Amino acid sequence: MVINNQNNNNQNNNQNNNNKNDNLNNSTTTTTTTATTTKSSTLFHSNDFFSGLIAGIVSRTLTAPLERIKILNQVEVILKDGTKYNRIIPAFKVIIKEEGIAGLFRGNFVNIIKAGPQSAIRFYSYGAFKRMASEPDGSISVINRMWAGASSGVVSVALTHPLDVIKTHITVIAPTAATIKNVTKGIYRDLGIIGFFRGLSAGILNIAPFAALNFTFYETIKEKTQQYILKSPPLYAPSIYGAISGGLTMTILYPLDVVKRRIMLQHFDRNQLPIYKNFIDAIIKITKTEGISALYKGIRPAYLKVIPTVSINFLIYEGAITLFEKK
């Protein structure tokens, strides 16, 4: 009887220990899951996405005429009578005369469809990458900030590049009455699915450094201004930071955009070879046949487009973030 009682007591003790271990394991699992969920939720902020979406739509719409003139100027060598677009004011007059005021906004609908999501994804992913690379106290090095910007650029352009191809064809080649559906069918019919990704490598090489430099310039200027000049800057301050960062970035990286547009717009039958085989080949041929200055064709309207675009983009983004955070 004594032995049986002792065995029963031992079994009860073992069961209690097992229950304690199970509770401890469940507690640990719950804590780990909660920590992972919390970390994930702190990395990704929906406010970044929606603020970026609004900023992209507004800024692109306001600068649509300059965007069209810039692209026409970049690819004038491909177009018949393309030289009529090589000066800003005359280009405005030509477009209005031939197509009316609406011609200045040709392709803007698809431009918005592309610019809105691209801006949303870029700000959303940049916020996540930046928080991922930040120190516990919130500080972040210049290198990590550039990495976050470059990564956000790659993600955004990879997901929206087909829209960029469609937008460029509507803006430059397609007739005024062309629809997104018709242009999409035409690209697929003539070039296949690969046609929607023509120029993607150049696009990534373009946007990755642009986003890296643009975000880094913007946040550095903002940070240093608040640290040494104005601790409480006015509401319009983001537009000034954005204008400066956009101008600096454009000057450094503009040639990549020219090459990307040239590659995207070269047309050829299936029995013919393309004008440019790849990104490097395009740079060599452009500089050899047209000179280095060809890589900067359209930079003046580009300044007039990019500087206001980046300026408005950051201004609207910061304003939207402030409004969302107050709710």
Curated annotation (Swiss-Prot):
Pfam families: Mito_carr (PF00153)
Mitochondrial intermembrane compartment residues: 1-48, 128-145, 214-238, 325-327
One Gene Ontology MF term: nucleotide transmembrane transporter activity
InterPro entries tied to this protein: Mit_carrier, Mitochondrial_sb/sol_carrier, Mt_carrier_dom_sf
Solcar repeat residue intervals: 43-132, 140-224, 233-323
Gene3D superfamilies reported for this sequence: Mitochondrial carrier domain
Keywords: Membrane, Mitochondrion, Mitochondrion inner membrane, Repeat, Transmembrane, Transmembrane helix, Transport
Family stated for the protein in its record: Belongs to the mitochondrial carrier (TC 2.A.29) family.
Protein name: Mitochondrial substrate carrier family protein A
Gene that encodes it: mcfA
